Amino acid sequence: MKKALTAGILLIAIESMIGTIFPQALSYEAIFGVASLVLVGLAIITSGLAVSGSDQRANYHSETKEGRTSRMKMAAAFFVAAIPSILCYLLTILF
């Protein structure tokens, strides 16, 4: 999780640079918001939360325990990487 958090912090540094380079074209809210939505969306997709109950049951029975664990770790890493962008998005909206 430390690597995912570090990647998230690097991502907000890159997002801040993009916002500084293109101040008229992109707002900080848009940059942080889009990055947050993309990372949370990837976490939802990789975790399997966006499937129906019957699909989830079929995936559970056809998937190995190691595969399920690695998929959940990947989803958690995407979500942890999204946390800094979400916090920056909230800070730009509130202040």
Swiss-Prot record:
Its main location: membrane. It is found in: Cell membrane. Pfam families: DUF5316. GO terms for cellular component: plasma membrane. Keywords: Cell membrane, Membrane, Transmembrane, Transmembrane helix. It comes from the Bacteria. It is a multi-pass membrane protein. InterPro entries: DUF5316. The chain crosses the membrane at residues 5-25, 31-51, 75-95. This is Uncharacterized protein YwkF. It comes from Bacillus subtilis (strain 168). The gene is ywkF.
